[in-house]
Amino acid sequence: MSDKRRAIEGCLIGTAVGDALGLAGEGLSRRRQARLFPDLSRPHFLGRQGMVSDDTEHTCLVAQALIASAGELEALTRALAWRLRFWLLGGPAGIGWATLRATVKLWLGVPPDRSGVWSAGNGPAMRSALLGVCY
């Protein structure tokens, strides 16, 4: 297995595991999180199984779009926008307001390069790690 493939797999697995471990404490103060979840070595959301958020789902969509586009920027943009549109149809739980607005704009025909919205959220940063590994 190549080093790049190992790095890509590690990024995807690390994103999912970190997301599953941290999801139950999202939005909680450090003190409240420590009181509710003293053992951070396992997932707490949905029992022992854990659950990932839209951050992991979108990282997987980025991976799919990278593969479909062979890394060509315009094709990547179209492939990711297409995937986001159909992801929204699944009725994702806990979707952020900015993600919802941007994806609805895609459905309304706004081009991907103009569908973004201003937000203080960290979603794009969470989903961009794979791009750093690939490029």
Where are these regions (language model features)?
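Structured, active/binding-site neighborhoods that engage oxygen-rich ligands
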Residues: M1-Y135
